């Protein structure tokens, strides 16, 4: 069977699936409308979907090695301003990262593979994942056994991308990292509140937070290999309610992104050390919480080789 030709035949249905999911964008772990739609479609195609944690899975095939096909399906907490007829009407959620595409494409893939199930040499397991944006979904489904029963031998996933790249272009990396690690952190600086006219009577957590922020940037400038891509960003800095009062606490939140495990471990460890020791110098303290701990995505060279073997010019 020409799978590419069959996919083109299903184009209108794939578009309709994408637009429904887009118009009903949901965020986080709980995606009731999206999950129900995915499960209904899989049942319509003859599969037997089940919940796996907060996600959905289904399996088909004839035994043997197991290939997992994964798509995320959550949106983002932001308003949509596209003006499209299928725009999300809530004003609070939107599919602006492409996960509506991913889920719709995997639904069509499931339909095509179900049609050809008798000819498959092996087993295909489908994974519809929530909460990719909050770094919770994959962990949730792994903890509920997505990689077991049957045990997964290899996995494939994809992500669409906007911009100037032509439609049909595939990007992958057979020599290293495809996507960076993401270690999200929250630093709560604890000081001592006082009136702004009497700073000597308190411990200023804003001052401590500023010094922590500046010191963290030196980790990239002086402690990581400039030939490697590493980024440390503080995206939130919140403190205080009044202009003339030194608050009790200040909160910094940020992310560390790297393309290798060695410097990921270095930066996470040094972030904690710098925050703790800087606070101590200024008579304060810190509480550090890791919000996310996602390793870098490194493409499997064997899977990459198999994928390349099935590419043909007319499909690229």
Where are these regions (language model features)?
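Oxyanion-binding "anion nests"
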Residues: 263-271, 275-280
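Short glycine/threonine-rich loop-to-helix capping motif typified by GTGT followed
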Residues: 242-243, 247, 295-304
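Conserved small/polar residues in nucleotide/adenosyl-binding loops
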Residues: 305-314
């Amino acid at each position: 069977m020409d799978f590419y030709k069959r996919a083109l035949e299903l184009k209108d249905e794939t578009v309709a699936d994408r637009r429904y999911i887009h118009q009903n964008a949901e965020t986080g772990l709980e995606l009731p409308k999206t999950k129900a739609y995915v499960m209904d479609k899989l049942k319509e195609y003859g599969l037997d979907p089940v919940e796996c944690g907060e996600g959905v899975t289904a399996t088909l095939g004839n035994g043997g090695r197991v290939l997992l096909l994964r798509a995320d399906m959550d949106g983002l907490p932001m308003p949509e301003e596209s003006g499209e007829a299928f725009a999300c009407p809530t004003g609070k959620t939107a599919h602006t990262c492409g996960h509506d595409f991913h889920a719709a494409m995997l639904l069509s893939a499931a339909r095509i593979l179900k049609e050809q199930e008798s000819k498959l040499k092996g087993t295909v397991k489908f994974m519809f994942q929530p909460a990719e944006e909050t770094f919770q979904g994959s962990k949730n489904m792994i903890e509920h056994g997505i990689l077991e029963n049957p045990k997964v031998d290899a996995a494939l996933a994809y992500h669409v991308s906007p911009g100037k790249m032509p439609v049909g272009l595939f990007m992958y990396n057979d020599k290293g990292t495809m996507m960076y690690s993401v270690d999200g952190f929250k630093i709560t600086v604890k000081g001592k509140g006082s009136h702004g006219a009497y700073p000597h009577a308190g411990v200023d957590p804003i001052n401590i937070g500023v010094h922590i922020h500046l010191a963290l940037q030196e980790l990239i400038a002086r402690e990581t290999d400039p030939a490697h891509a590493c980024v440390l960003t503080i995206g939130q800095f919140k403190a205080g309610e009044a202009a003339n009062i030194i608050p009790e606490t200040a909160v910094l939140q940020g992310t560390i992104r790297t393309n290798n495990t060695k410097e990921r471990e270095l930066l996470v460890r040094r972030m904690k050390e710098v925050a703790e020791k800087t606070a101590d110098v200024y008579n304060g303290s810190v509480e550090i919480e890791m919000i996310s701990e996602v390793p870098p995505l490194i493409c499997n060279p064997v899977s990459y080789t198999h994928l390349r073997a099935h590419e043909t010019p007319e499909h690229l």
